[in-house]
Amino acid sequence: MKRIYIAGPMTGLPELNFPAFHAAAQMLRADGHTVVNPAELSNSTDQPWEYYMRLSLKAMLDCDTIYLLENWQASKGAFIEFNLAQNLGFHIVFAS
């Protein structure tokens, strides 16, 4: 069983793209994986971007796999997460 971090675009999207994050988390959990979903890490949305990135990166470090949502390349945060995952030897999975 893998511990999977979900990465993808949020900023500027309707509902911060939470529906896509939740759908991916549901699918991955149904397959038996432990999932870290950044959309579930905080109940607030009033902090600066850097606050949420720090929170997400801390949670990501406990994972061994990153699951990249569609259009992840358009997200500054997801690009940072992808590069970190690559450098730490994570298994990388792209949403299809």
Briefly describe each language-model feature range.
Residues 1-96:
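Conserved catalytic or regulatory cores that recognize and/or transform ribose-phosphate-containing ligands
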